[in-house]
Amino acid sequence: MAEEMQNQEQQPVFQLQRCYMKDASVEMPNAPQIFAKQLEAQPVVDMQFEVAIAALSETHHEVAVRSTVTIKADDKVMMIAEVKQAGIFLIQGFDEQQMIHIGNVVCPSIVYPYLRANMADLVTRTTMAPVHLPEMNFE
């Protein structure tokens, strides 16, 4: 019985504890003027991504993925939207190399679909054309 307990303690554990939207913002610095005039050029969409990992304890880690979408037309910013989606993960029993892979690849892959949905919803609420973030391979 004691051996079984010891084996269970040594088994690697990986579990998503919580997934949440940590931050969201949208700015439309040139509204309503951008809606009133005919655009001379096609809007340009710029997307930026960032992954951040923070140890909350020896076994719990927060992994956050942030995306910033900037839409410009005629040299004017039409919209800037930013969403930061995070997850709290229980991770224990892995070696250092595995921990790096889990933090940089596995966890962001779990959190990212929620970020995509929240960004699409946020942009849609501005009445701008929908912006759908691309699928992402964190490998």
Place the predicted regions along the sequence by residue.
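N-terminal intrinsically disordered, cationic/polar leader segments
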Residues: M1-I110, Y114-E139
